[in-house]
Amino acid sequence: MTSDKYLDGGLNALQRCYKSFFDKLSDKMGSAENVSGTYDDGGSHIYLVWSVAVYAEAMADSLKFTNKYEKKFENVFQCLKRYWSPEYNACCASYYFQGNNDVYFDDNAQVAIALATAGYYTSNSSRKKHYLDRAEAIIAFIINQGWNQQKGGVAWHVNSGSPPHANLNACSTAMCSLAALRLAYAVDDPKKKQQLVTFAWNCVQWIESNLVDHTGLVCDGLSLNNGKWDLDSTKFTYNTGATLATMALLLGFNDIIKGLPNIDKIHSYLENMASAALNTSGEMYDQSCKTNFKVWKDNTFFAQHLSEGLMGFSFAMPNSSLVKSAQQMVFDQADFVMNHVRDPKDGLYFRDLNIYKISPELTNTFNKIFHADQHFQPDKDERVQGSGPVEKLPLCKSLIGSSGAARMLFPAAEIIARKNNPQSGPILGGRPASGEKDKGCFIC
């Protein structure tokens, strides 16, 4: 236990996920029940790579604060290898088999973020090389095969980047730019840093030009229909949050970004987007809330990115008048998640911040907290998958729900850590590497 409830909460969520969803004998991550985000692999309910990636990101985040889970991260790394496609040099959505082309760029960006972050913070040089080599392979795949050479932006899936059914998404473009920067912090080669930072800035400019609308928030993406690119104006916390986080990280590369085109706009981009993200009358907030504090209208594994983005903004732009509000929003959302999305029976988390989608009891809680008048709206993803009325199916917890919650708590913990030990710049500095190979490291 530490003196920080957010750090303790995040670490506890990781440990409970490890005990509940990781099979140490087979290096598999799955569920005893058929829950959302799993697929049937010979009778076992195995998690799709997205869930494992979010858990890996949360594990990597923990290394900023403690080496407690360094060995466990190796186990997760072994698990991720089961999804690895040698054809793509990236992870498939499910376990790899020859001919498996179900490969998503946003999934792989989150895998790369986990590996690059772990590589940056690990205290062992052997692990660092293994993690960063794999992260570099993924980023090369993203840049070479994901970026649309004609329109710009990053495709969602390897089969959705070109006509007749092309999609260029905020989730993929923002997450890939964030992954590139996490890797740029971890590598030493100046040329590689330059290439990664340039790619990330290109992604930000594309998002600003194509997906940011009059609200100042990031829309979901572009779809090609009958030769015309149509904008999906849906606003998810994921997209605005990841874009904020990317811009915050960019400001840590002062010497590199000086020569980038239009880089003088980055501060206004950041300020305007943070302001929009903090507008509680906006689309990312649940407007059924009648109180000053409104919960985000999303799930934990989307909202995690907005927590990270607002936290990053607050340290990248320390003189902004929005810093205090941004940090308070991170705390308030984290408090809500710990108090109401966490199931005290097992310490794991549900998925929805809009808890009226979980149970009648939590609907009553929501209405009481927010002076709202919501009706119970059962979400099938909060329940064991099956037939019959959704509300009759048993409630369940998932890897991605709890991992997303952990990643909402760690930004709050980072704010506290920096207040106790002031440190400038957009990211916490890495713990010093040992420079020695770990003989007990079974990935070496």
Residue ranges and their predicted role:
Residues 2-58, 62-106, 145, 152, ...:
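CBM-like carbohydrate-recognition segments
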Residues 59-62, 115-118, 180-183, 187, ...:
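The core hydrophobic/aromatic register in alpha-helical repeat solenoids, strongest
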Residues 71-186:
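Extended ligand-binding groove/face enriched in aromatic
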Residues 118-126, 183-195, 250-261:
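Inter-helical turn/loop segments and adjacent helix faces that build the functional surface
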Residues 171-180, 193-249:
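Active-site cradle of extracellular carbohydrate-active enzymes
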Residues 239-255, 259-282:
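Oxyanion-binding "anion nests"
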